[in-house]
Amino acid sequence: MKFTKSLLLLIVAVFASSNAAETFSNFQVTNSDANSPCVTTPVELKVNTCQSACGSILNVLPVTGSTSKFTFNQFGAQDTKCAATPTSSNEFTCVDGKSKVAIGTTTYSVVCVPDKTNSSESDSSDSTRIGASFALAASVLLSMLAI
């Protein structure tokens, strides 16, 4: 009986935490360099897509096993297809939605844009509310199991 309760508790905890996680596949990037073409206008980068942005060739790659950690890569201007090793890179985490990412001699401001899982969702706070709902349901179930 104790094993069954423990197993149920584990399943509920995993389910609640997995539903609260946000995923990202788009990033708005600006550059601190005054000569950059994207100082005032953010450029939107997509995951795993090489793009000419901020005067450089950039791409963002997810870190295996994480929905919020990414490697931000900068390539030489001549390497338009990102076929070679990046000239510089830096791993960053989307925590508060915004990160300063220094790669090479440049510091980029990266705004992580949460994926929309449902067209009726208006912003990232919806996914937070969904996660909170699952957490509440999990605590109710836990209290029932304790009785």
Swiss-Prot record:
GO terms for cellular component: lamellar body; membrane; plasma membrane; side of membrane. The GPI-like-anchor contains a phosphoceramide group, rather than a phosphatidyl group. Residues 119-147 form a propeptide. Keywords: Cell membrane, Glycoprotein, GPI-anchor, Lipoprotein, Membrane, Signal. A lipid is attached at N118 (GPI-like-anchor amidated asparagine). It is a lipid-anchor; GPI-anchor. Belongs to the ponticulin family. This is Ponticulin-like protein C1. The lineage of its organism: Eukaryota, Amoebozoa, Evosea, Eumycetozoa, Dictyostelia.
